[in-house]
Amino acid sequence: MDQNLKKMDWNVTTNGKSFILYFNYLVAHYEELPFVLRMRYAFRIIQYIYYPVLAVVGFAVNILSIVILPRGKCGVSRCVTRYLVAMAATDLLVIILDLILRHIPIHYQKELHFVRSFRVCNIHAILLQAATDCSVWFTVSFTFDRFMAICCQKLKTKYCTERTAAVVLGTVTLLSGFKNIFWYFILTGFYTLANMPWFCYITDDVLNSPVWAAIIFLHYILTPCIPFALILLLNTVTARRIILASRARRQLRGASSGDCPSDPEMASRRNSIILLFVISGNFILLWAVFMVNSIWTQMYFLGYDSVYIPFYVMDIGLMLQVLSCCTNTAIYAMTQTKCRQQFKNVGKYPFTLILKLIKR
């Protein structure tokens, strides 16, 4: 495809339509619009509400997680707590850098047009991509920690410690920051406020360079393709180990069918596998569309444009990807009784305080 078309697609701003204009246009021209445009306009309308609501909910949930988890009342080890707090902290950063400082200004350009005056878009991109990488690889690190705890009993006491968790998390953070420095040279400092994967203007040299396209392609291979493969592999091995161990334990206890309800070890294993699969499965499901679309986009710029993916697929991918940053902790709270109770207590506290003040 002609490179000029690529420039036009990736370096122009959106027309800054408001929610009302999008809605009225879709209603007035619904019958005459092709399906692809119907879907794209529909998702743009949804995003006007979706992103602000998600920002508020995600910000609150992750702040609560950072406050509650370190108190040690959720029934998990200090090592696991380290990982969960780190995941909540990086998810909070993604919410700030991606939702609040990127997606919301894109959809509310009239109210937030002053964002264009800040020429720090490439620095913003470095911070956002580094935070995103940390969020993804912290999930991988947590999955590997649970794999070691369940499948490698001899190494469990050495690896599954608070100190090791701190070293792993620190190393991942440093590598993620170093890995994403190249965005400073690919992107410019000017914001486009366009609803595209890149929210900064891109120079012609980058658009026409297969070298830069290959570097960006490699970036998406490292995150999230490799994490996908690692999480699937580790979960498969871990699940097999838990199932075999549980079966052997049932036989030793003389239970031919079903779990013994009075067996605390079986309950602990069941909780472990639920937590592991829900958090990592949530990551896989919510990142799948974004990963496929990102890989296709880079193949398109490398010249492989035989397969067409509609633009609304990109919208779906972005919406699900940012949703993943708000769900890990919420899912954890739903699957762990003690943690769920802590969140309930915090949620009830303001109302309890108000009632006490009223009674006075």
Protein language model regions, located:
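Extracellular N-terminal segment of 7TM GPCRs
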Residues: 1-61
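Loop architecture of class A 7-transmembrane GPCRs
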Residues: 26-37, 108-131, 178-226
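Extracellular TM2-ECL1-early TM3 structural module of rhodopsin-like
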Residues: 40-52, 79-142, 149
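Helix-to-loop junction signature of class
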Residues: 51, 55, 93-111, 132, ...
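Helix-loop boundary elements of multi-pass alpha-helical membrane proteins
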Residues: 63-83, 144-167, 261-276, 338-346, ...
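Intracellular effector-coupling site of seven-transmembrane GPCRs
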Residues: 83-84, 89-90, 201, 240-290
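Fourth transmembrane helix
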Residues: 93, 97, 104-107, 131-141, ...
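Seventh transmembrane helix
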Residues: 227-231, 274, 282-286, 291-292, ...
